[in-house]
Amino acid sequence: MSGLQTIINSAQDIDISRASMVATSVSRSGRLLTAARNWVKPWKFTVSAKPYWHYDSDTRAMIEEILTLDRHTEKTIYLGANAGSAWTIAYQGAGVFGATGFTFNTASAGTNLVLNLGTANAALPTGTVLFRAGDIVQAAGDRYPYAVTATVLKPATGTTVTVVTNRGLITSATAGTQMVAGVNCSWVVKVSKLPTTRLLPGRLVEFTSEFELVESVI
């Protein structure tokens, strides 16, 4: 487990921002004008580390790894990677993933993510909830996860479903790539704000501020 993942797994709290970058202006007539300038909508995380760490060999190694990677190296992180925080990103549907489950369909475009049902999902009753708003879905091995914006039900006919996502497709996966959801999704990030460490009596150490992470979109 990476040092940054250790920080996330034991964090006091994590702030998540997915807001678009929006330009706002006021016209001479007093009208408020807005324009979204960012199609990719990168995820941003502010992570508050737990207050104190025992300054033992494991903690020193963790800190050294984080400082070595610094703010210029990409890291892959997971949310809900331990049992106590899995609820934060748990998959809410009743669909099946894996070899007989959802796979990527290259008809996907824009915010419409088209998925092949696979034999397991095709056998589910009509109307089964496959995805709920807020679910996170990703093509296995791809850099970018997507948030589902509306409930998706198993159709009565057909072999595909369309999932509307929070942002347009950034990269297209290979046809037939298996999909993952929930705690199996990952983010590639860079640290935009790296706190310093403070040594305390009793062989303790603390981080002096939050970690700020930004999704690395290329």
Please give the residue ranges for each predicted region.
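Extracellular/virion structural assembly segments
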Residues: 1-218
